[in-house]
A protein has these predicted regions:
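Bacterial N-terminal signal peptides
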Residues: 11-22
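Exported/periplasmic ABC-transporter solute-binding proteins
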Residues: 27-55, 59-62, 66-76, 83-86, ...
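Bacterial N-terminal signal peptides that target proteins for export
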Residues: 2-13
Length: 254
C-alpha cells in the first residue's frame, strides 16, 4: 500500500537531510537569491534562521520584480527568484530559465494607503477623492506588481486620470514607501508589510483597500539552478517556522 507523506513533512525531511549532509562539509555553501523589494524584511529574518540551522550563507538582492526578471534573462547569477507576482516566475519556467515544477506561492501580498502623519488617511481612504495632498507615491505599475495594484485601486476610485501630475513613481514598492516616509509625498500606496511589523507599531494613518479593488498579489518563487542548498532554502521557506514569520509581516500564506 502506498503511504502518502504530507507536503510539510516532506519539506522538513529535505531540510533535515541537507543539514545532516552539510555537517560533514568543511565549507558552507553560498546561495544568491533575487527578492522583490516588498519582501525584504521578512526574507531577511527567514534567511537568518536558515543560516543558523545550516551554516550556509544566503546573499539577498532586493529590487523590483520586473528589473530582476530582466537581470535573470541577461544571465544574472541567482539560484532562486522570489517575485511579487506569478507572471515572471512562470515566464522564466516557460522560457527554460527556471526549473520546471519548482514554482510555488510563498506569500499573498496586501496593499495599503499610508501616511506617516496621523489623521491624513481615514478608514475609507477618503483623501483620494478630497485631494487634500500635493503628491502621492506608488511603485511603477510597469515594473512592480504592487504598483499595478495601486493603479487598479486609483482607477476603481475614479481618480487615476486626474492625479497623474501628482503621482510620484518609485522603481519598486520600497522606494514608494521612502517617498512617503521622507515627506516627498504626503501619502503613498505601500506594502502592508511596511506598516505591520512584528512587535512594533509603525506611526501614521492608513487605509486597507478591499481586495475587490485590485487583483490578488500572489507572490511566487522559483528555482533557477539545481542546487542542493537552494532547494533546502526553498523547502525551509515553505515550512511552518517560515510561514509564521511571513504571516507576522502581514502577508497571507496558502
Amino acid at each position: 500500500m502506498e503511504v502518502l507523506i504530507p507536503k510539510r513533512i516532506q519539506l522538513s525531511l529535505i531540510l533535515a537531510l541537507t543539514v545532516t549532509f552539510c555537517a560533514g562539509q568543511v565549507l558552507a555553501d553560498e546561495i544568491r537569491i533575487a527578492v522583490a523589494s516588498n519582501f525584504a524584511e521578512a526574507i531577511k529574518e527567514i534567511a537568518e534562521r536558515f543560516e543558523a540551522k545550516t551554516g550556509h550563507e544566503v546573499i539577498l538582492a532586493y529590487g523590483s520584480t520586473g528589473k530582476h526578471y530582466a537581470q535573470i534573462k541577461n544571465g544574472a547569477p541567482f539560484e532562486a527568484f522570489f517575485a511579487a507576482d506569478v507572471e515572471r516566475p512562470k515566464l522564466l519556467e516557460d522560457e527554460g530559465r527556471a526549473l520546471s515544477g519548482s514554482r510555488f506561492t510563498y506569500a499573498v501580498g496586501k496593499l495599503v494607503l499610508w501616511s506617516p502623519k496621523p489623521d491624513v488617511v481615514d478608514a475609507n481612504g477618503s483623501v483620494l477623492n478630497t485631494g487634500d495632498f500635493r503628491f502621492i507615491a506608488i511603485a511603477n505599475p510597469k515594473l512592480a506588481p504592487y504598483g499595478k495594484a495601486a493603479k487598479e485601486i486609483l482607477q476603481a476610485r475614479g481618480v487615476w486620470d486626474q492625479l497623474q501630475k501628482r503621482i510620484v513613481r518609485g522603481e519598486n514598492i520600497n522606494q514608494a514607501f521612502q517617498f512617503a516616509h521622507s515627506g516627498n509625498a504626503e501619502l503613498g500606496f505601500v506594502a502592508f508589510s511596511k506598516v505591520k511589523r512584528p512587535n512594533r507599531a509603525v506611526p501614521g494613518s492608513f487605509w486597507q483597500p478591499p481586495q475587490s479593488l485590485y487583483s490578488a498579489i500572489d507572490q511566487q518563487a522559483v528555482l533557477l539552478k539545481s542546487n542542493a542548498t537552494a532547494r533546502a532554502f526553498m523547502a525551509f521557506v515553505q515550512g511552518e517556522e517560515a510561514c509564521t514569520i511571513i504571516q507576522s509581516y502581514g502577508y497571507g500564506t496558502l
